Amino acid sequence: MSIQDCHVFCSLRSCIFRLTSLVLLAVPALAQTPSALLPNLRINPPRSNVPPPGEWRTTALVEESEGRVYRLHGKAQVEGAAVLFAADDIEFNEDTGDLRATGNVYFHDFGKNEQLWADRVEYNTESETGKFYKVHGETSPRIDARPGILTTNNPFYFEGDWAEREGEKYIVHNGFVTNCKIPSPWWTLRGPRFDIVPGEHAVAYRSIFRVKGLPLFFTPFFYKSLEKEPRKSGFLIPNIGHSSRRGIMFGAGYFWAINRSYDVTYQVQDFTARGLAHHADLRGKPRSGTDYDAILYGVHDRGIEQGKTLQKYGGLSLSAVGKSDLGDGWFARGTVNYISSFRFRQQWSESFNDAIGSEVQSVGFMNKNWSSYTFNVVAARLQNFQSSEIQVTDPITQQVKGLEANAVTIRKLPEVQLDGRERQIWKNVPLWFSFDSAAGLLYRQEPLFSGDTLIDTFQTGRLMDRIHLAPHLMSAFHFAGVNIVPRFGLDETYYSESQAPNPDASQALQLPVYRVIGTDLVRSAHDFSMDLIFPTLARVFDNKTIFGDKLKHVIEPRATYRNIAGIGDDFMRFVRFDDTDLLSNTDELELSLTNRLYAKRGDTVREIFSWQLWQTRYFDPTFGGALVQGQRNVLLTTAELTPYAFLVGPRNYSPLVSVLRMSPVGQWSAEWRADYDPLLGRMVDSTVSVDYRWSKYFISAGHNLVHTDPILTTPANQLRFRLGFGEPNHRGWNAGIDGVYDYHQQVLQYATTQVTYNTDCCGLSVQWRRFSFGTRNENQFRVAFAVSNIGTFGTLRKQDRLF
């Protein structure tokens, strides 16, 4: 039997499913921000004897017809190419389009894997209007597999007293939606009415969100955009939290979709014990290949009592990232970071690494690469805080003058760079030419404190010139199994200003201190180096072990001789901006030995162990007069060997640098970096990290030790640890702890403890955090509730979660 226009009924049924699932998506927030659209791949089980498209097959225990009116009784079914409609009784008038189904009505859309049940259906295929009574159904979920989103394979389920269609609008009355298992769902969103306009929006009115029957919150209006790129202005869900130093926190926000290319999110938080915090996020994508994101955060701090003094730590921070494809091979990218004070960062930062980070760096560049050349235009600002702001006292009146930043500030406004990679000069001659060049306008400022007294300020001109050119020639030879790579180069650098000793400040600080003088200075250096790459020694072990079917041990010896001359004791006259200014005389030989162990299992080969050793022999222990006795010396040659400074006087050899890495089994890895100084006869610094994960269990630990001359750096002895059980989508209990303990200060600087319980459709997380460093001593308590496939609301941010 051929029945036309049955697709109209399918449209109503499909929209009911969309209404329930899309209204459900409105739970996390009233405002809709742009999100990535992930395609849903559904593999439907094959069906046999499927009717061709446009044709319908009917079956029933009793079939009757009067003209174009069809009546089906007893196990009545109407099946099409993609859908199945079943009921106890079905009546369809092909002339008027009226369709009535009663008794155990069932509908299945095989294409979308959606199912619907109802007691009774009245529908007109001509006017595309109809009603469903005592309806419930389910549809496959849209799984949004983003970080921080709890997911589930449970279908979305809904119930309603009745549902209707009016033109393009679909309405479900007196119902609820959930994606939990029935009949005892963990959560429901229940309301008297749900509206949907396909392709535009879905709305829930006067709805109540319940968890295990307990009302969690009520809202008179929930909105969810149904557009492919949802953008709708609106208010964000309020949140609440608590901190031992900030008091109770109440937060609210608004999302403004300016147009399809720009949006702004504004959030305000009221800390009852401290003041108001403001957070503004501006995003833009004005054209293809160009986008940016800028976040401004500020706090108006009423202050906190410390002793008998009210201390205020208000301020602001700005962070922004952006990039743009300018076409024709040109590309621009930038990162902006700014804080008004280091005190503000320590007090109000929500990340431990951010709160203790002393560097604030901004850089923007425009780049083009072609052939073997690279061209950059760079603008940069680096602010390196030496400590929190210092309350300065007038040395004469002894009156407090205010807070001064104790930070080194370096700017490049701008610097133009042109580099050329190695390029063979003649085809049959092993000779390659390369060069580095740069010209920029630079600036450096550094305050000089003695206690709480500002002695002087080291400061260059606002636009100091520096021009740098370094051409190099390289060759390569092979002799008796040894690869020989000689290299010769020149280094010419012009400075429009230089530095000279500052006797007054040096006497006050009892340290060598410099001041800027307006004397032009040219640095002319020449360098020669030769790499000797010796043949590797290798042995294969065929015995099968727990690491693999075969093992291979490789030894890689190498030596590098380097000679740089022409700088001498002029080294101290150059103002420091970056590693270009750290070049000094040297006459040295670096020896290195690397052991590697490879394991082969089947066709897969991986490195399971490596141990690298370096040490440098200095034939010029004073580096041409650049070294200053009794103070910390940082030269380019020593900085390239190890990040830890070790020069406080002349010496003939460097510490022995060791890096050991192990990854013997899949889920276990370890690394140990250490410097052993034969001159002191001990390990001067050591960094160890170990990571292991088995099933749902994980553990990570690290130890950092600095035990060297106090002139070089402040001693350190810290333990980092993280351990726990669980993962973001693990059902049941999850728990973990993360912390940093300072043995030197005997204090737990940072700790996070999180407990999460996930059900089949939602999860509750509780987290306690402690900060104890610098000017901050604070405990925080945070809670978050997650709904699977939808999102999370609460005060626990996804970037602060352990899992």
Where are the model-predicted features located?
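Intrinsically disordered, low-complexity segments enriched in proline/serine/threonine
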Residues: 14-16, 30, 36, 222, ...
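Outer-membrane beta-barrel proteins and related beta-barrel translocases across Gram-negative bacteria
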Residues: 113-114, 120-178, 182-188, 192, ...
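Short linear motifs in intrinsically disordered/low-complexity regions
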Residues: 6-8, 41, 532, 790
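Bacterial N-terminal signal peptides
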Residues: 11, 16-28
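Immediate N-terminus of the mature polypeptide
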Residues: 5, 32-36, 63, 247, ...
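Compositionally biased, intrinsically disordered low-complexity segments enriched
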Residues: 6-9, 24, 34, 280, ...
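Charged (often Lys/Glu-rich) extended helix/loop segments that serve as interaction or gating elements
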Residues: 33-178
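N-terminal secretory signal peptides that target proteins for export/translocation
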Residues: 1-15
